Amino acid sequence: MNDLPFWKRKTLAEMTVAEWESLCDGCGLCCLNKIEEWDSGDIYFTSVSCKLLDGESCRCSSYENRWDFVPDCVQLTKENVPDIAWLPPTCGYRLVNEGRDLYWWHPLISGDPETVHAAGISARGRTINENEIDIDDLEDYVVDWPLTVGEEKDEEEEEA
């Protein structure tokens, strides 16, 4: 019997629905509004969250019905994950797709869904809901932390 966890022995395409869903660490970073520069294609994260993101749990408040409220919500699928450039570098789907392991704080590793928040990886406490701003001011909310979360712990592990 193979003792490797499913994310180390299966491709995204081979995963069951339950395995697929469990790859989400609950960070909420994919639910942040992003700005794409037309000329360069560069993508910038903002601290402005989707109106459905629960800022405390970092989960969608209406996951099953999200398209009723946010028609352009991007559903991550086994087919599109390889092509989505804006997935944060710590995203479980991205990591597994790239053949990398999950981080120590991922709930599948830690056994606790709170470690993603305790480690400072998630959007918890860092966002403003899109309903609370003038969308024309979105560029005033550009942040880099979704691209740098986790770096400090990684550096500490490398030094150890």
From Swiss-Prot:
Superkingdom to which the source organism belongs: Bacteria
Pfam families with a match to the protein in the record: CxxCxxCC
Family per record: Belongs to the UPF0260 family.
Matching PANTHER family: UPF0260 PROTEIN YCGN
Protein name: UPF0260 protein Rleg2_0895
Source organism of the structure: Rhizobium leguminosarum bv. trifolii (strain WSM2304)
